Amino acid sequence: VNSKQIRNFYINEEQSVYLLSHHDAKKHRQWLNICIKQLTLLGYSDVELIGSGAFGFVFAGIDDEGMPWVFKFSRITLAQSVRDRLEDEAYMLSQVHNPLVPKFYAFERIKKQGILMMERALGEDLEKISIKQGRFSAAKIMALALKLRNVLIDLREHKNGISPQPIVHGDIKPSNIVYDEQTNKLSLVDWGSSVYAQIDAEGNPVASNFMDLMSADISTTNARMGDVYFIGDEQMSGGQSSPRFDEQGVASTLYALASAQSCRFGAAVIPATSLNLPMELARVIDGMLSKNKATRDSAGDYFMRNMPTMAKAYLPELPRKLIRPYIPYWFSEFDEHPDTVVYSSRKQFLRQADHNQQLLDVNDAQLDRYYKEFLFDTGDTEKAFLASISRLAKYPVVGGLSFHWKENSLFVESSLILHDETLGTAFTDAINNTVMLAQGIEQKGLFKCCLFDARKTIQLERDGTGAFKFEHLPELDYEVMDVQASDVTRPHSYFEDGKDPDEQLQLPKKVIKCVFELNQIHHTGCIIFEALPDRMKIHHYYRLLDASKEPEFKRLLSKLMQYAVSITDVGVAGFMKLPYKNTREFDLCAKQADEFYPRDPKRILME
């Protein structure tokens, strides 16, 4: 299979363990158990996995004095040059002495395996808190802005002896900032992209001595790639490392948390000035996210200089206005928490027609992710829209969405079921962002996505001849919820929008005929066939809305599985059916209106 064929299958970046093949999932579990055993033998207790990324895994444990430690393991499957980065990270972390940065303890190498040991930052990362709470208040954003600005000052003022040697973190984003509510302590973690700055904030070369300046290659960069959803333009385009990189990371972080997004790209459509922040801070954040370098730098200088004064503003927590969701969703009556994954199709039109370049030799894990996730030739608003769809999959939600852009309007059809009522406010923020970003897209076209529970995914392995192996054919799972017939005036169809140009999998005619028969029964759901050379994954979510048809529905689902095993082609194809047509229409809107934190909050509190 060439890489292009599978590229359209777009799932949230931390792939669910339920989507790994049986062999890979087993290897994954064995490897985690080996790490836990190794750390337990070294005398640590309560060892647990607390995170994983492109480069490795992170464990936590308690030492014999009761102190919490963190252990970062590099993935041994990576190239040696990439594994060596963990040692570089250990060195950079050892250079930073700041109360907001976890202390470096040691770096060990056991055979090929590097292990970085450091103090544990207690609490929860801000991305997780943002998913639970939605938009951060003005007071929280202001307090965070001041703390991050103070860390940046410390990094800029780092010296080697008496010579200036500024440090760049290179990957400031919400998930790399850990907050402990009990102690009100903030920690900046993950120094894997950290380097010594090559140029200062003014763009002048940094050299510890005259000889360094003479020998420095001023055309190459030592910069590492941070998270492509948060880094600024200079870092993204391979510019020389500079303290400006971290200004950009801070601006992206403040913007993402204030707006309840998981990236920086939405700022043209949902500017900081629309997020109920104090006017001065909102304008500074928008300036720092500007496409114009001079504007960015001048806003960054203002931020660094004036943040302590700005932070003195009186910003009491005001009662949050009741925000209604722009599109409806329901809470599930079932207790189970789905492990949500999103599949989206028909993204082709979101790309910019004049950019067809493709980097085939992608050796950086972050860049690889950038290309896989379809971002390399889409505009910023389109990137933000796709990232907002990914953010929806961070909630325990199942269902489907369809966005149709025509002339001056956006039409949205949806069916969403959230499995946790405590997340209602935050999910409303997430879904409203998706709609506002969609209102800012000018291209005309159609975009659809399904959200399903990865735990229900059926996996069938192929034998040497390509035929599927199974003892008993698995069954497609479904729920039943009886809806009054009078509620169904305009049924929605699987075949509503014709053939999807993005999908390449040729399905047998009998599979399509079976879907056609299912279409006659009132239900909602999706089925996605992801056929790989060695196996097939069948992702699905079904909810029958007419209980009287259950025997027929069950019979057709069983038939569908029998026909699915005759698929020989490789690729992806899917069908989605919403419960009924309930189209919401929105005007297009290139930029949301200004909304600032009130000048006189006392008056509002007294009302």
Question: What do these predicted ranges mean?
Answer:
Residues 2-40:
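Juxta-kinase regulatory segment immediately upstream of eukaryotic protein kinase catalytic domains
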Residues 78-95:
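AlphaC helix of the eukaryotic protein kinase fold
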Residues 107:
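Activation-segment/catalytic-loop signature of the eukaryotic protein kinase fold
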Residues 293-295, 301-318:
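Terminal C-lobe "cap" of eukaryotic-type protein kinase domains
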